[in-house]
């Protein structure tokens, strides 16, 4: 069972991916992790990737697909996997298909932009411990202070509204196109992944219940 989760940053994909991994005993595959592992192990593809990256270039889709094929052939992927951060573009999705890598489920977790901004820009962190708060959903006992130490909380650069809106812009211009791509594939029928859209405004538990219902049908 190979799964792709789509949705904007902050939609809850990471949380749901962890729950899926635990329930179905499948790994979450990150292209970044694959690249780092291949470079560390000195594999042929890893050495090629290292050379490209050291020269300031972008690792090609062809090379990434090669890494994906190596990764999914490993024993822990026998029951399937969740793709994390890949594909990001239609050419990458087409490259997956052309390499004969089948996808069983594509699930979109939909959340409006303004809710994403609210979720992410409200986060505050205690740098020393990594404890994370939210000014509305999980506020500290004393505004701006860590509950344990009383030290100042900070807003990470990634959680600034300007940064969030830039990330959303990138999502809409690139990755969101995959929604239409996979909807079309699902409609085509034979050997196509299923496509489902879930309302990410609901609680984690409710979204999880719907996700599991979809995946249990074809387990």
From Swiss-Prot:
Q: What class of enzyme is it?
A: transferase
Q: Which residues bind ATP?
A: 10-15, 123, 132-133, 202
Record-listed E.C. numbers: 2.7.4.3
> Does the keyword field hold ATP-binding?
yes
**Function comment:** Catalyzes the reversible transfer of the terminal phosphate group between ATP and AMP. Plays an important role in cellular energy homeostasis and in adenine nucleotide metabolism.
- Tell me how this protein assembles: Monomer.
The domain comment in this protein's record states: Consists of three domains, a large central CORE domain and two small peripheral domains, NMPbind and LID, which undergo movements during catalysis. The LID domain closes over the site of phosphoryl transfer upon ATP binding. Assembling and dissambling the active center during each catalytic cycle provides an effective means to prevent ATP hydrolysis.
Which named protein is this?
Answer: Adenylate kinase
Source organism of the structure: Acinetobacter baylyi (strain ATCC 33305 / BD413 / ADP1)
Taxonomic lineage from the root: Bacteria, Pseudomonadati, Pseudomonadota, Gammaproteobacteria, Moraxellales
Q: Which gene encodes it?
A: adk
């Amino acid at each position: 069972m190979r799964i792709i989760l789509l949705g904007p940053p902050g939609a809850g994909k990471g949380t749901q991916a962890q729950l899926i991994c635990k329930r179905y005993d499948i790994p979450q595959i990150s292209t970044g992790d694959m690249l780092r592992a291949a470079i560390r192990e000195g594999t042929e593809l890893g050495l090629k990737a290292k050379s490209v990256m050291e020269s300031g270039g972008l690792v090609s889709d062809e090379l990434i697909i090669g890494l994906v094929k190596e990764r999914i052939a490993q024993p822990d992927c026998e029951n399937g996997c969740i793709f994390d951060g890949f594909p990001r573009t239609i050419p990458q999705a087409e490259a997956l298909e052309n390499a004969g890598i089948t996808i069983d489920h594509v699930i979109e977790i939909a959340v409006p932009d303004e809710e994403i901004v609210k979720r992410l820009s409200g986060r505050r962190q205690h740098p020393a411990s990594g404890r994370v708060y939210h000014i509305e959903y999980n506020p500290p006992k004393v505004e701006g202070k860590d509950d344990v130490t009383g030290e100042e909380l900070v807003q990470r650069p990634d959680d600034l509204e300007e940064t969030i809106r830039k990330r959303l812009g990138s999502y809409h211009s690139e990755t969101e196109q995959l929604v239409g791509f996979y909807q079309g594939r699902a409609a085509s029928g034979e050997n196509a992944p299923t496509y489902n859209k879930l309302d990410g405004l609901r609680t984690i538990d409710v979204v999880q219940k719907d996700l599991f219902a979809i995946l249990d049908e074809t387990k």
